[in-house]
Amino acid sequence: MSNWKELFDTEGIVEESVKEQIEEPAKYYVFLLNDDYTPMDFVVDVLCNFFNKSEEQATDIMLTIHYKGKALCGTYTAEIAETKVEQVVQYAFENQHPLKCVMTKA
């Protein structure tokens, strides 16, 4: 009977196969870009509501955007980054602001 067990004991093989197939998903950075028209308080609102930043964190990021032209809002998987970009762009459009949000591969 030990031959039977040896023939069908694939536990170690399956574990190795699964470990080889699982890899970390690619990460993407999401940035907000500066413009001359979007109010600073709107940018803070976006950072608090879409990126779960505190008021203080959002203000710091907003000032970085204002003075450096862009700032990192977060790092996400591709699907989440795409969703955040779409949500921010749509929200800005609905509120008649030209705020731009982009994603780049990390």
UniProtKB/Swiss-Prot annotation:
Superkingdom, taxonomy of origin: Bacteria
Protein name as catalogued: ATP-dependent Clp protease adapter protein ClpS
Sequence intervals crossing the membrane: none
Family statement drawn from the similarity comment of this UniProt entry: Belongs to the ClpS family.
Subunit: Binds to the N-terminal domain of the chaperone ClpA.
Intrachain disulfide bonds: none
Swiss-Prot/TrEMBL GO biological process terms: protein catabolic process; proteolysis
Pfam name, any one: ClpS
Xref: SUPFAM superfamilies: ClpS-like (SSF54736)
Gene that produces this protein: clpS
Protein task: Involved in the modulation of the specificity of the ClpAP-mediated ATP-dependent protein degradation.
